[in-house]
Amino acid sequence: MRFASLGSGSEGNGLVVESGGTRLLLDCGYSVKESEFRLARLGLAPDDLSAILVTHEHDDHVGGVFSFARRHALPVYLSHGTFEAHRETHAQEAIGVRVHLIGADTSFAIEDLQVNPFTVPHDAREPLHFVFADGATRLGVITDTGCSTTHIEKTLSGLDALVLETNHDIDMLWASSYPWSLKERIAGRLGHLDNAASGQIGRAHV
């Protein structure tokens, strides 16, 4: 199994997970053209992908998903809550796209990869993150998450590799010029992991 990031940040997110002949794109927060460019830098074309998975409805994760999927005839896997939340503001985007609704803790296969979605605390409708397995390797991916939970700890046990968000230094956040409401959102239990919390999760599971 291999993985590579298309990018990570408020402007967009995307990650490719590969095993055998299967390549999954996790999130697509970029435009179609930008996503194609970033794939090409990895030596990949859209036709090399098998499907797109979505973590949640925030634009930096889902902004390009349906346009890219429609352009390249790719199925999209996401939770019911994420799908409905996105449709409330982008009602027409999913037309012509094969959508598969998935739920937490219900594993499924996409070709050579087994996918285990799990729920995380984040300020979205029904966010999911994922553990990928191919019979030899288990890879966990956890990005936009406010805090760790017992369920997350259990789900991430026994991994071979972990892609983990390290979003901010808590002291620098509180000292920053961000509006107070944004500071509270980022630091809250439904926000983003600070560097220390991410380090604790990483040390415990890899």
Regions of interest found by a model, annotated:
Residues 1-42, 126-144, 161:
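Conserved beta-strand hairpin/beta-sheet module of binuclear metal-dependent hydrolase folds
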Residues 74-83, 165:
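Short internal beta-strands
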Residues 150-203:
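Cap/insert and terminal regions of metallo-dependent hydrolase folds
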Residues 7, 28-30, 57, 81, ...:
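Active-site metal-binding loops of divalent metal-dependent hydrolases
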